[in-house]
Every structure is written in C-alpha cells, then in structure tokens.
Amino acid sequence: MRSPIARRATAFSMALCACLAACLSGCRGEANAGDPELVMELAISPTPPGVGPARLIITLRDTSGAPMDGARILVEGNMSHAGMVPVLDTASADEGGRYYVPEFDFTMAGDWVLILEASLPDGRTARIQHPLRVARTPGGPKG
C-alpha cells in the first residue's frame, strides 16, 4: 500500500503533466476541431496583413493529403477586445482543395483571431482558430 505522500506526489505529477501538455499544444498557433481526418490550413497575403484588404488562401485536405473539394468555408474575424463587430466572409472554391477570400477586410490594427469553419457535402466539418496581429500598413511593422 502506498503512503499518502506518494499518492499526493503521483497526483501532483499527473496534474503537472496535463497542464504542460495543454500549454505546449497551444504553442502551435492554430486550434483544430471537427473531423480528425480533415486538415485545414490558412495562408495570408500580405504577411503580416495590414489594415484593409488581405487575401486569405485556405487549403482543405484529408490526412492522406488528398484535396477536399466542394466544401463551404465561413470565415469570421474577431478582435481581441470587446465591442468590435466581427468581420464575416465566405471563401470561394478554387481547385485541388484550395479556397480563397480575395479581400478579407481587417478594419483595425491589433490582435485578431480568425475562425474558419468548413462543411463538406458528406457532413464532415473542420474548424480552426488562427490568432494573428494586423499591422497598421500591409507588410509593415506589427501593431
């Protein structure tokens, strides 16, 4: 039988590992949700984006790398402070699992979170959250 101190040490170690895993998984910059067999990636031009229009290029594929065409992808942009109206748009389909928003309008410099939600005709979904900082001018210094 283990002592109470050993049980507490084990519980503490497990809690510490869980916290560490949660922190490290957040370092990637994107949080994926939905069907684990779908992978959605985002590229933005210019980088960093500035106040005004930016092109969003979205790639949707399965885990084997096969492109996923026919999806409907909604994009929502939110600033990190309260009171800002979200910027909403829908991506247009290209080919080879590529979708784009030609002019996503970043209305203000600062910290943003883009939320992309994809729905395929077969009912599968994918969702990512992509934090980013919008510069005062396109391609200029952040902030």
Predicted regions and their residues:
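N-terminal soluble domains immediately following signal/targeting peptides that reside
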Residues: 27-143
